[in-house]
Amino acid sequence: MENRVSLGSIQKAVWDGRLPLEIVLASSESRTFDKTDPYLISYPRISYLPSLLPKLRAFFSNFLIDPNSQSHDGWFEFEGVPLKWHYPVGLLFDLYAGVDPASKTAARDNESPGDGSSLPWRLIVHFSDWPPDLVRLDAYGMVMNDAFINSVKEADFLRNGTAKGIMSLSKEDSSGLWNAVQEVDLLSFQRISNILLPQPSQPFRNVPIRVFLPLLPDAESSSLKVVQTPLPPSIPASSMQSSQILTSRSGSTLQPQTVGTVLHTLLPNLFPSRRTPVLAKPVLHGAVIPMSAPIEEVVRSSAYGDGWAYIVVRMMG
């Protein structure tokens, strides 16, 4: 019971997490060039940037050179990189802005490294010249909804070995899951997501986890490098404390798969140790997660709304 309470409190903290955003209209699309006031908001980490577009379109409407542009024409840019709208904003921040401040130029406005200069996160919104490598949005939000549900299906298949759970949801619950994420309604989300999750006494078939490799500061390409493979929540036991040893149906002894064993398996050169970060550290929701944390518990408590734990690898030193 204590474990359930603990996991529940972590999930609540994840859903309560917010990022301060400062969004400006692209100067090339503004009647006043770069003189428009920024749009400031404290935005939930689990939310998606396109949900802001109607408010942004209204906020900047008097300054747009093209008055016929629509909110679903909008897209976001950070330091020249178009942001992938199907990723939650918290993940995007961890990928592009949540880096070691010492590796950034010290000085926007003569700020020194380490003083929190990456916040608020400064983004540029465009309402024209849609990037060719981004899927276009539609006026009714169906493209966003479909992308989210498809991601939920993938996670459901990994957890259960089948996507029957999400496929058998009523239309009301299926749309309700996406609405709960948009509205940051954790109670409504839990009611529906608990239908899809195996009971705590029943382990996942595989854990839905994606690991994002570090972005090179001067890389010519903005494409993300993602590592993903089916990973069971338990592995053959080694030298573990007896309290951590499990027994499989076949009688073999197992131990919980941890963040450390996952990263050592996927990226042994970056994570030569299963217990201690040496060259890189794993970041989820802006925090470094312990290498000893059981990966299934991490997913149950800290997955984004689509059921995936998105771990960002950040280099040390």
UniProtKB/Swiss-Prot annotation:
GO cellular component entries: Atg12-Atg5-Atg16 complex; autophagosome; mitochondria-associated endoplasmic reticulum membrane contact site; phagophore; phagophore assembly site membrane
Post-translational modification (record): Conjugated to atg12; which is essential for autophagy.
UniProt membrane topology term: Peripheral membrane protein
Chief localization: membrane
Keyword annotations from UniProtKB, A to Z: Autophagy, Isopeptide bond, Membrane, Protein transport, Transport, Ubl conjugation
Domain of life assignment: Eukaryota
Cross-link Glycyl lysine isopeptide (Lys-Gly) (interchain with G-Cter in atg12): residue positions: K153
Localisation: Preautophagosomal structure membrane
Keyword Protein transport included in the entry's annotation: yes
GO molecular function, one term: Atg8-family ligase activity
A GO biological-process term: protein transport
Primary role: Involved in cytoplasm to vacuole transport (Cvt) and autophagic vesicle formation. Autophagy is essential for maintenance of amino acid levels and protein synthesis under nitrogen starvation. Required for selective autophagic degradation of the nucleus (nucleophagy). Also required for mitophagy, which eliminates defective or superfluous mitochondria in order to fulfill cellular energy requirements and prevent excess ROS production.
UniProt record similarity statement: Belongs to the ATG5 family.
Protein name (record): Autophagy protein 5
Record organism: Penicillium rubens (strain ATCC 28089 / DSM 1075 / NRRL 1951 / Wisconsin 54-1255)
